[in-house]
């Protein structure tokens, strides 16, 4: 029927609006919606929530040296490797460029550091075809009582920046609020 066809088109459009075309990961829009929902949930019911953010090291040089097709290949490779190592509850999103974030519901700082470390090791253990070893810098932040999504995102982003500043290719815990 027409209604069934319309429903399918609607579902396809929704999927397109929340996923990254290149990697198939969820996009920034979906991440923002989901983060707000998860924060509302932990504020209501308690529990834990953490973010693991990563930024591919020297990505511009990959693009400059090997071309944009190779850059796209690196992004796709990273998504596949990350997806294979995530737990079922984790949500992988591409924020844009070479930046990814994993939303980890029901996860505290210690658990999130373990998730990030496993992802970091998985990425650095296998070279990308035609490019070689590509690493990433990771930041980890757990939600703190009363914290906004923007604040949590800022802290995890600052942790990635600290990892880059400390020499890249590492996992860095965020500084607690206050």
Residue ranges and their predicted role:
Residues 14-33, 54-68, 76:
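Conserved nucleotide-binding and Mg2+-coordinating catalytic segments in signaling enzymes
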Residues 91-94:
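A short pre-motif secondary-structure segment
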